[in-house]
Amino acid sequence: MSNKVKSDIEIASKAEILPVTTIAEHLGLDADALELYGKYKAKLSYDTIHSLKDKEPGKLVLVTAINPTPAGEGKSTVTVGLGDALSKKDKKTVIALREPSLGPTMGIKGGATGGGYAQVIPMEDINLHFTGDFHAITAANNALSAFIDNHMQQGNDLEIDGRRIVWKRVVDLNDRALRKVVVGLGGPIQGVPREDGFDITVASEIMAIICLASDLKDLKKRLSEIVIGYNYKKEPITVGEMGYEGALTLLLKDALKPNLVQTLEHTPAIVHGGPFANIAHGCNSVSATSTALRLGDYVVTEAGFGADLGAEKFLDIKVPALGKAPDCVVIVATIRALKMHGGALKTELSEENVDALAKGFTNLQKHTESIQTFGIPYVVAINKFITDSDAEVAKLEALCEEHGIPFSLTEVWEKGGDGGLELADKVIAAVESGAADYKRIYDDAWSMEEKLEAIVTKVYGGIGVELSSKAQKQIVEFKKYGWDRYPICMAKTQYSLSDDPTLLGRPTDFVIHIREFIPKLGAGFVVALTGDVMTMPGLPKKPAALNMDVDENGNAQGLF
């Protein structure tokens, strides 16, 4: 390879890409199993998905991470690279990833299909409109908003209280100006004026529903259970009471089908869904993972942000819906993130600082302990960056050895699957050991307070929970409706184990502050809001979009 550092899109644009029908053949599927979106993308048909249901599932590997820096730690890159490495080890491997959101792509990320020589392709298609899943979800979400406003305009038989509508409109962009809006202005024929707002599409409950629904029947049932707001008696109103679950299911019937693409090294990749990892559960769809498990001997998937958010939700929310727990967990750690947790300034993360690295190591330790709480073996993937010094790498390896933490120095960004062969060996050994003995950290029958305590004490390392007066009243209300039986989906900062984004490393003696709960009954969980969690991001001063363009031949530029 050239010593010149190439951008992701430069690498992807020069890659040999096989017809998606050829990728399907690797999985034992013929062309009739696919619904083609051009030569290189396809959806798997419902007939195909149904035909696989009785097959024995393969082995599942979950990739998570330590608490990240704002730029991320390369979790998707390691997921792709590990998948390619397992393929090189003659394991029939399928990767299951989330779809990127246009908002972060145009904002700060510039793309989210892995990086370097560990990417999913066609990367520009996946990063932009792909097969239209997010647009369908946006349309369904906003159709529901239109149905709500129309119901109020046309007599309001359900006595919807416009002040207590909790359903928001969405758009798949970072647009802070839309966080709070007023709709229905302009006189009686324009609708009933009320306050409204926009979330980003990946924060929509419909996104979470798509990612947890097992089939069309389950999708329709979940859509009917969405709480859109409350009536004048403060009683909840659902989509089912309004009668629109059928129309919403119709809008989403194709979006529920998983998408098949490939990596740079032609490992099959099923890329589908993409809920926020802070406000929702942050995992790709149950349909995608379940299908992948029946097509491959090994499936590598990821969960959003760090193990405190993404992995906990994968294990406590997605696994019960999937019916299959991971056989091994890979925890991605980077030297730059550990230095940040050890007190190094964000502007100095590229500079050698062995002392900060050693101090920040406690963050990694906590995440390894949390995964062990779930009874699953793990391997730490040290995702090597070109700015890491030899002294820093040696120090981190020594710390892992000293504390009995299994690890592998991983260089998939630079070397593709070849850079993850040792990691693949250690993952295979962990999987084949049969050591996985999965257990959730709480039971659905527990009280909401008990579930919160379990997450905070066992996963975050805190000492307890403090409920606002609003949250306390909501718990009483939720018990009345039976909503306390749902799993808890914590909405908190990804940067810290606590709810304070400035409290880095491994904080102790902290309390998690719950300000309110949001029932997401269609998704099947209750969101617990901590701190200031944003459901509609804003753009940075210099968005990644400033560097994006397209040449006269239609080739994308600036995605990275």
UniProtKB/Swiss-Prot annotation:
Alphabetic keyword roster: ATP-binding, Ligase, Nucleotide-binding, One-carbon metabolism
Task: Identify a single GO molecular function assigned to this protein.
Answer: ATP binding
Please indicate if the UniProt record lists Metal-binding as a keyword.
no
Keyword set includes Lipid metabolism:
no
Q: In which pathway does it act?
A: One-carbon metabolism; tetrahydrofolate interconversion
- The broad enzyme category this protein falls into is ligase
Taxonomy, superkingdom: Bacteria
Q: What positions does the entry give for ATP binding?
A: 69-76
Catalysed reactions listed for this entry: (6S)-5,6,7,8-tetrahydrofolate + formate + ATP = (6R)-10-formyltetrahydrofolate + ADP + phosphate
Its EC number is: 6.3.4.3
Q: Which InterPro entries does the annotation name? A: Formate_THF_ligase, Formate_THF_ligase_CS, P-loop_NTPase
- GO BP annotation list: tetrahydrofolate interconversion
Q: Which family is it part of? A: Belongs to the formate--tetrahydrofolate ligase family.
Against HAMAP family, the record matches this protein to: FTHFS
Q: Could you tell me what this protein is called?
A: Formate--tetrahydrofolate ligase
Q: Which organism is it from?
A: Listeria monocytogenes serovar 1/2a (strain ATCC BAA-679 / EGD-e)
Q: What is the lineage of its organism?
A: Bacteria, Bacillati, Bacillota, Bacilli, Bacillales
